[in-house]
């Protein structure tokens, strides 16, 4: 697991700006063990922080000239320090160093020693977060504002007196930067600027390398490089609340010459909502009360940091290769402090912006979030036991996770070649623009998704409202239909009653005529009986023929008169019989017509309901056609309404 114990450190060259004369260097080796891991036994001692009590190395390690432990990646000249320049700007040595200096003492390349690091390089451009080449020079802060310029760290200030009196040599450059390294730790920057001599270096060494001595990490080790954090926090000029040029990541140098660092602090408020409350709180503390409160032992609780990392670390992107187990030990230190870089003067917007920081869509990808090369520059976090990864050239974006080890090696070497050819600035700018466009694309996607959700909710609300209106209209139509049916029935009953009332007068007249006819018949029958029974026919009756003739003649006259009257009544009776027969036929027809009328009334009610429904549907169809000509298509299709 501890690969750094077997590696050698590449030498660092002094900066041409402050250290023009290249001093002689003596090869030294240094062995670094993890601060938060149990120390593992090594075959030879390691080289501690610069002090006079540095242990000597074995003959096999001394035989390799200009080799040092790769974990620290710095070289110390033996020239005395200059009083006017306590530290030199950080310069990238990945371009100046030959390929042989990057080899180990065993002759193997770094990718053969760090397979997990090389594997993460091959997939760094395939995940949603793109790695940016970080080998660049440190830019000095603009001298426009005197109170915001970077000042040397507290360790440098404390050791300057010992340097000028005891040892006379130039200060070493502050932690050179190479493509294999990310942002340097603040502890490394202060360590490079310390002299070798002095009894106080042993105490600092004890705090810096606790795994070697066996001591515990105290609060002093958390406050070693606080002035550097103060420099970075005070070196950030505050501008207006707008984004302005802060989105273009002005702290990334695009040329070898140093340029002023212009960075607005409004990005902290703009992007502060994307980071966990712990990091936002620490960033505000660093801006108000300096770096003493930013990295103090009381402000950064390990449980809080672990919770923030667990909340900010997303799931790995599908298709990306999981990170090696050797990197998981320092996940919290490298991922939490990404937005708190202070040693290089990078503004908080670089660590907290959605394009590089811990945005919800990008987060900590396995190729970047688990790599210590993009970690923070705070001294309170332990150094990783494995060498940090380096970014891949953007021209190798098409590499897949199934690339072999040889293709990964070719990609890394091609990136170094491109850096030597001067293509790094354009690559950084292209990657930065790509991230800006990707962030804009994510913002648009979010806005479109939110608009679609709002429209979907509005459509559901409109559909529900239309359905409720349709239901109310249907109930109202049913009520109106029932009222119309009742009214039609009442009209038919009134018409039937009027017809029956006209027939009742004739029926009453028929009863009167029948009584008169019966009375006349009774009188005729009684007269005939009287005339027949009163004639004497037997018993020796004698009658006068003349008087009998006259009586018979009078009886015949009466009978003729009665016959004539009967014939007249008979004609009337026949006419009455005909009328009664016709009345019976009419009554029969009336009963049949009443049955048909009932059937027609029932069918009329059904047809009336269908007519009302069709008219309502026609009205709604015309309205929808009119709305289609003015507005977009209807939210609710017509087929959803179950019309009767």
Swiss-Prot record:
InterPro entries linked: QWRF
GO biological process: cell division
Motif (QWRF motif) on chain: 443-446
Biased composition (Polar residues): 31-43, 141-157, 184-193, 350-380
Stretches with biased composition (Basic and acidic residues): 197-208
Entry GO CC: microtubule
Disruption phenotype: No visible phenotype.
UniProt region (Disordered), positions on chain: 1-112, 124-284, 314-410, 622-644
Top-level taxon of origin: Eukaryota
Residue ranges with Low complexity bias: 49-69, 124-134, 245-259, 318-344, 399-410
Keyword Nucleus: no
Keyword terms: Cell cycle, Cell division, Microtubule, Mitosis
Described purpose of this protein according to its UniProt entry: Contributes to the assembly of the acentrosomal spindle and phragmoplast microtubule arrays as part of the augmin complex.
Protein family per UniProt: Belongs to the QWRF family.
Assembly description: Part of the augmin complex composed of 8 subunits. The complex acts on microtubules and interacts with gamma-tubulin in spindles and the phragmoplast.
Protein name: AUGMIN subunit 8
Protein source organism: Arabidopsis thaliana (Mouse-ear cress)
């Amino acid at each position: 697991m501890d690969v750094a114990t077997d590696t050698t450190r590449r030498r660092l060259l002094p900066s041409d700006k402050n250290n023009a004369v290249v001093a002689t260097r003596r090869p030294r080796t240094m062995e670094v063990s993890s601060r938060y891991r149990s120390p593992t036994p090594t075959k030879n001692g390691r080289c501690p922080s610069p002090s006079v009590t540095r242990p000597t190395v074995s003959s096999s390690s001394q035989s390799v000239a200009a080799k040092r432990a790769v974990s620290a990646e710095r070289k110390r000249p033996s020239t005395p320090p200059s009083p006017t320049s306590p530290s030199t700007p950080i310069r990238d040595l990945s371009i100046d160093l030959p390929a042989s200096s990057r080899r180990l003492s065993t002759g193997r390349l770094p990718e053969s020693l760090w397979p997990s690091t090389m594997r993460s390089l091959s997939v760094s451009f395939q995940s949603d977060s793109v790695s940016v080449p970080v080998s660049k020079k440190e830019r000095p802060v603009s001298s426009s504002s005197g109170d915001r310029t970077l000042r040397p760290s507290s360790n440098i200030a404390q050791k300057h007196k010992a340097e000028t009196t005891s040892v006379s040599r130039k200060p070493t450059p502050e932690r050179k930067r190479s493509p294999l390294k990310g942002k340097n730790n603040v502890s490394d920057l202060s360590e490079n600027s310390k002299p070798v001599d002095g009894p106080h270096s042993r105490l600092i060494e004890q705090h810096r390398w606790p795994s070697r001595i066996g001591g515990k990490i105290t609060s002093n080790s958390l406050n070693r490089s606080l002035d550097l954090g103060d420099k970075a926090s005070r070196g950030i000029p505050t501008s207006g609340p707008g984004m302005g040029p802060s989105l273009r990541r002005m702290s990334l140098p695009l040329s070898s010459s140093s340029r002023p660092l212009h960075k607005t602090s409004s990005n902290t408020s703009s992007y502060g909502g994307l980071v966990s409350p712990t990091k936002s709180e620490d960033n505000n503390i660093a801006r108000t009360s300096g770096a003493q409160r930013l990295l103090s032992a009381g402000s950064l609780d390990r449980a809080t940091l672990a919770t923030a990392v667990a909340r900010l670390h997303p799931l790995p992107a599908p298709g990306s290769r999981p990170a090696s187990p050797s990197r998981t030990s320092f996940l919290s230190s490298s991922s939490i402090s990404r937005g708190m870089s202070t040693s290089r003067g990078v503004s908080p917007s670089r660590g907290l912006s959605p394009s590089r920081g811990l945005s919800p869509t990008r987060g900590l990808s396995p190729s970047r979030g688990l790599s210590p090369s993009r970690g923070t520059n705070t001294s309170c976090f332990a150094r990783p036991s494995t060498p940090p990864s380096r970014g891949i050239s953007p021209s190798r974006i098409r590499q897949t996770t199934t690339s072999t080890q040889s293709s990964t090696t070719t990609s890394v070497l091609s990136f170094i070649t491109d850096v030597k050819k001067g293509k790094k600035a354009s690559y950084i700018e292209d990657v930065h623009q790509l991230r800006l466009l990707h962030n804009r694309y994510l913002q648009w996607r979010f806005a479109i998704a939110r608009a679609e959700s709002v429209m979907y909710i509005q459509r559901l609300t409109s559909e529900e409202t239309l359905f409720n209106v349709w239901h109310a209209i249907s109930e109202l139509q049913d009520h109106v239909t029932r009222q119309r049916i009742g009214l039609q029935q009442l009209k038919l009953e009134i018409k039937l009653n009027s017809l029956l009332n006209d027939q009742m007068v004739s029926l009453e007249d028929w009863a009167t005529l029948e009584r008169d006819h019966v009375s006349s018949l009774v009188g005729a029958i009684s007269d005939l009986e009287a005339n027949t029974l009163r004639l004497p026919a037997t018993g020796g009756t004698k009658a006068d023929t003349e008087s009998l003739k006259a009586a018979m003649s009078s009886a015949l006259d009466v009978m003729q008169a009665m016959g004539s009257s009967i014939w007249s009544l008979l004609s009337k009776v026949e006419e009455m019989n005909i009328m009664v027969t016709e009345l019976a036929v009419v009554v029969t027809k009336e009963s049949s017509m009443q049955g048909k009328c009932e059937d027609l009334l029932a069918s009329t009610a059904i047809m009336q309901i269908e007519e009302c429904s069709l008219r309502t549907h026609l009205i709604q169809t015309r309205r929808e056609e009119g709305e289609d000509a003015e507005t977009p298509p209807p939210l609710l299709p017509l087929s959803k309404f179950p019309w009767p």
